[in-house]
Amino acid sequence: MRFFLSFFIIFISSVLFSFGIPNEILNFGSAIAGFSGLVLVYYALLNCGSHKRAAFLYGFFVSFVHLMSSFWLAFFEDFAIFTLGASTLAYFFIAMPFGFLLYHSLQKRENLRPFFFAAIWLLWEFAKSTGFLAYPWGTAPMICFNLKPFIQFVDITGVWGLSFIVPLIAACLGEALQTYAYSANSKAFFKGLTEIKSPLIFTAFLVLIINIYGITILSIEMKPATFLNTVIVQQNTDPWDNSQFEENIKTSQALSRKAIFSANKKPDLIVWSESSLIVPYKDNEDFYGILPYDDPFTRFLADTDTPIIVGSPYIDGKKQYNAAYLLSPEGKILDIYSKIQLVPFAEYIPFIDNPLVVRFFDKLVGFSSGWNPGTEYKVFGIKNSEGKTVNFTVPICFEDAFPAVCLNLHNAGSEVLINITNDSWSKTKSAEYQHFVVAHFRAIELRTTLVRSTNSGYSVVVDPKGKIISDMPLFEAESVYTEVPVYGHKKTFYASYKDWLPIMMFLILIFNIFLEKRRAKTARF
């Protein structure tokens, strides 16, 4: 196949896969578009003709999907040069070695190459979603939101199971497309299919088992151990606008009172979003005792007589943290959790103690400070209206997109994940829904309830099967009083054994490389 044709197919596949991910037209994406895009990726790489071409084509695919689906990163104020520009360029080069490996996997026997292709794809998505530079967007699981029975098995494998089975299905369909393209007639096509029947039958059987498992899980009724009556506030204001500081707090207070009044019932907990109090609450309690002037924050707490989760900076000596506070109705700090997984180069700049790094960032974006990463996986606890203690954790912003962060928070003893987020800067529906889709897998992986309180969307409550219990429209000032089901703390297979699947796939590939080298060495003698 000529390079131009391969490039054109990769371009089409990038567009299709981007439509598979939640976007401005299809709020929750399209599995059909996503799978179609992956089939074309397989077909293009299979026929591109060389490792170098495959590396370039896959680098283009990854970077272009990133650019199309995460274009809203350009709205991250002063950081667009990093969040969109540098990241797009970086993904092109980082993905190239995986393109090389994918092409290498396609040189194996027809019956084996779909499995090796899927294994390498899984390792790419694992690498992309892990570590300081991690960004778990633009991945295969994101096209599967509407396939509820199909995604339930992530409580065994984590989302890595989807990162394997989705490209495996696409690879099998790609093999069928390859057979069709090189068949003179239907008889030759069906004869060709018999030559690749092993991966086709195995994959079909695996998909059947996965769906039977999912249907079974969805049919089992889960009874909550108790409920946490929660007011979720979506103030739809910009916390970065210092001129609106008081108005933002007053809006959040008014929305909280509105939800309580509508329910005519005292809540167990109020949840405000990330950065709702931009002046650090700790050491500034007196400040919040007089502001806002006509409705001070601490008086509001006393009026509602309810604990609150609220996002506010936390300063400890010279270190600053993006934090979530649990405050009592009296305004006392009951506990603080500091965000661990920070946005690279936006919230956290590595080696910032180095004068050269300071000068570089001062020159480039006009400042060189940021948050420090937290170090402790905290679990908060309060008593609900039934007198039962409910333990929960508060991943901040895009921490709910990271399996490892939420898994460690859950394993610390959490019964509910309560995420607080500020995504208003994105200004797009697709950003809000993408974040939600990535995050909702945590509920299924850990079989726990997920609550998301955001300042503009998507504020939602998700049950342990990924079903939406309650939500609010995007970019509207709104609040809701909801009974959050609490199912008690338990560990799923994935919570117990963590990232066992990518580790196993990595070891299999290393063993295969060892065998290849051994065979090559034997063949020379």
UniProtKB/Swiss-Prot annotation:
Regarding protein family, the annotation reads: Belongs to the CN hydrolase family. Apolipoprotein N-acyltransferase subfamily.
- What is this entry's stated membrane topology? Multi-pass membrane protein
Q: What is this protein called?
A: Apolipoprotein N-acyltransferase 2
Pfam families xrefs = CN_hydrolase, LNT_N
Whichever gene encodes this chain, its name is lnt2
Top-level taxon of the source organism: Bacteria
What GO biological process terms does the UniProt entry carry, in alphabetical order? lipoprotein biosynthetic process
Q: What is its EC number?
A: 2.3.1.269
Q: Which UniProt keywords apply?
A: Acyltransferase, Cell inner membrane, Cell membrane, Membrane, Transferase, Transmembrane, Transmembrane helix
CN hydrolase domain sequence ranges: 228-486
> Does the keyword field hold Zinc?
no
Active-site feature positions: E274, K339, C397
Q: What role does this protein play? A: Catalyzes the phospholipid dependent N-acylation of the N-terminal cysteine of apolipoprotein, the last step in lipoprotein maturation.
Which GO cellular component terms, listed alphabetically, does the Swiss-Prot or TrEMBL entry include? plasma membrane
